[in-house]
Amino acid sequence: MKNRTSSKQGFTLVEIMIVVAIIGLLAAIAIPNFVRARTQSQKNACINNLRQIDSAVQTWALENKVAASATVSFGNISGYLKDAVVCPAGGTAFSDSYTLNGITNKPTCQKVSSSHILAPDTTT
């Protein structure tokens, strides 16, 4: 008689469960870091947009010899911006992303006002 040895190959249920648990643990560590990095990059991009807007406002005011108390609109500064600026944290247009606060005050972000703030000038 021939001896047949059963040579079943594959992973056991325990091995598969261990691999799934390890993948879950790695995901639990990686996902919050990814979300935090994404939020920080959106904040940095928004603050850069605020700098560009402020620079456009100041340039427009200087070139047109506008009084410091004058109001400014997006139509006034659109020619001074290379591209339309939108808050990366969920804005769809300039008007729902940013507020122009005159010439002497910095523009502000409407989307996440608590963290997307352009710091005042410290040079005097």
Predicted regions and their residues:
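Conserved catalytic core of two-component sensor histidine kinases
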Residues: V20, I47, D54
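Extracellular/periplasmic head regions of type IV pilus-like filament subunits
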Residues: S55-Q58, L62-T124
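N-terminal leader/signal peptides at the extreme start of proteins
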Residues: M1-F11
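Catalytic phosphate/metal-binding cores of nucleic-acid and nucleotide-processing enzymes, i.e., regions
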Residues: T12, R51, S55
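Internal alpha-helical transmembrane segments of multi-pass membrane proteins, especially GPCRs
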Residues: Q9, E15-I18
